[in-house]
Amino acid sequence: MLRKKPPGRLLSKTAHKVEREYRIIHALAKTDVPVPKAYCLCEDDSVVGTPFYIMEFLDGRIFEDPVIPNVLPDHRRAVWADAVRTLAKLHRVDPRSVGLEAFGQPTGFYNRQVATWRSICDAQSAVRDVDTHEAVGPLPHFADLMSFFADESQQPADRGTLIHGDFKIDNLVFHKTEPRVIGILEYVHVLPSSPPPSLSNKKKPSWEMSTIGNPLSDISNLVTPYFTARLDPSRSVNVHPGFRPRATRGLPTPDDIFALYFSVADAAPPSNNTPSSPSSLELTLRTAAAADPRDRARELQWAQAFNIFRLAAICQGIAARLAGRQASSEQARRHGEARTGLAEFAWELVQSARSSSGGGVGKDGSKL
């Protein structure tokens, strides 16, 4: 299949970076991370109008619903288990060993994230409705949230690994019959009808959000449905009752996921992925392996709180688009209104992280 940059001037300098996508997919082919084969990259605009690359077509299943309905509990459990193992394999890839040492900054990921989202939220809150002139306004507890997240003494240990940026079940392609990941994708756009459970034009192998960053950002994104399931559906979006404790047979708990993830991420990577001297990645993984489990639990709580805050900020952005009449659908309205409940929930998680003694999250349900 061919993936090309859209014609014309792009609003975002980082969007549709097909050259970057090719680079990481091609590099990961040397590892045990399941990615499609990238055959060639053409940066000559005269061929098809914009740069493009050609890659392998993945013929498999995509589960739009992360609960994975209509399968047996054992299959559901195995699907989630391989997704978790796949993420851990990605995170244990040393960027130097595959030529991606310049793919992003190796330190300071969460500090940059906090600064970026503070700036974005400030701009979004100042947007005024074109008719009422009422400002969108800040998120609840915004100043306190920013103060907490910016406090380096509260942040997780600074780590730098390859991260996907939007890792979740519906961004993966699974084997047609086996509970096995055959490729990592990224959600690009939504079609109005439901496609069959195979790779369609609803999913394209984009890695636009990938960089070098803290691996906790990916693992917290993967388990987000477990946390948002606690919310009132009338005040939020994407509240999936199937992720409530014991609601779905075969679905792992967050603790199950964390345990499997760290068991794989902390293991030594394959020999062809290990440089001659220890990298910062290897050292941080070794440090994580030896860390007090209570510290690890605290870091996971911090990362989840930040991820929920980020969702609130995204919904605030949709509210700003509504105010400027750049969006008008009912779905957009619901997302815009969800910013309040998500920000309140992020604040609850922050308070829990502050007072936590390091206990795990979620003890109910089946084991991987």
Write out the residue ranges for each language-model feature.
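Start-of-helix signal in alpha-solenoid helical-repeat scaffolds, especially tetratricopeptide repeats
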Residues: 18, 302-305
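Surface-exposed helix-capping loop/turn segments at secondary-structure junctions
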Residues: 31-35, 92-103, 126-131, 155-156, ...
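Generic alpha-helical structural context detector
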Residues: 53-56, 85-88, 115, 119, ...
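Active-site activation/catalytic loop segments of kinase-like enzymes and analogous catalytic loops
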Residues: 199, 217-272, 277-288, 306-325
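Regulatory N- and C-terminal appendages and interdomain linkers associated
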Residues: 313-368
